[in-house]
Regions:
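Residue-level signal for pocket-adjacent positions within structured domains
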Residues: 11, 16, 44, 110-113, ...
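Conserved helicase NTPase motor core
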Residues: 8, 25-128, 140-147
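Conserved P-loop NTPase-based nucleic-acid remodeling module centered on helicase motor cores
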Residues: 1-12, 19-23, 34, 183, ...
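Short linear capping/connector segments at secondary-structure termini
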Residues: 19-24, 75-78, 111-112, 171-179
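Helicase P-loop NTPase motor core
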Residues: 134-138, 142-200
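Alpha-helical scaffold elements adjacent to nucleotide-binding pockets in ATP/GTP-utilizing enzyme cores
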Residues: 3, 7, 94-97, 125-132, ...
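Proline-centered turn/helix-capping motifs that create local helix->coil transitions or kinks
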Residues: 12-18, 103, 158-168
Length: 200
């Protein structure tokens, strides 16, 4: 059941209904599509929607109703999206429908903080935005107020190995702070014991 839940949610995040999914004669994929279809029919009969369905229905509504889309394009002349690194394909499509024509779009995001890929977030949306929108200005917020220099230096060194990022160099006016130490826990209980001991 959990695997099917992720499958259905993932397909909706991509803007795909069961009839849009190509199975390529893969029996597993065909089974998943049938379950997706049955799930959607059951939801429709019961008058229920999941979160991904809310997003997809709004997207389809705008795609299939140019008059309504124009109304919202005129109503929302400026669009701001925060935590942009956590957007999925349908949410990116929303942004394109609402804001691309006017070009008055501002996104705020950190491509080094994308942690919701398992939930459909596509870090590629940041790169897409910078290539698909005209006159994009990137403002890097690199000064950090929370961490010490030692932590930031280690983080910068580690994340620099990721070649699929826009790039930035975090810095702080704070002092170097404690040196970083590494503890390898045997399991989650050992990890919890170590952390609680350090906190005391």
């Amino acid at each position: 059941p959990k695997q099917m839940q992720w499958y259905i949610n993932g397909k909706k995040d991509e803007g795909l209904r069961p009839q849009h999914i190509e199975t390529y004669d893969d029996q597993t994929e065909e089974t998943f599509v049938k379950v997706y279809q049955a799930y959607q029919e059951a939801c429709d009969r019961a008058g229920l929607v999941d979160f991904a369905e809310l997003l997809l229905r709004a997207h389809e509504l705008w795609l299939n109703n140019p008059v309504l889309l124009k109304h919202y394009q005129q109503r929302f002349t400026h669009v701001l999206v925060d935590e942009f690194q956590d957007t999925n394909s349908v949410q990116y499509a929303w942004l394109t429908l609402l804001g691309k024509e006017s070009g008055k779009v501002m996104i705020v995001g950190d491509d080094d903080q994308s942690i919701y890929g398992w939930r459909g977030a596509k870090i590629e949306n940041i790169q897409r935005f910078t290539s698909e929108y005209e006159q994009v200005e990137t403002i890097r917020l690199e000064q950090n107020y929370r961490s010490t220099a030692n932590i930031l230096n280690a983080a910068n060194k580690l994340i620099s190995n990721n070649n699929n990022r826009l790039g930035k160099e975090l810095w702080t006016q704070d002092d170097a702070g404690e040196k970083i130490s590494i503890y390898t826990a045997f399991n989650e209980i050992d990890e919890a014991r170590f952390i609680s001991g350090r906190i005391k």
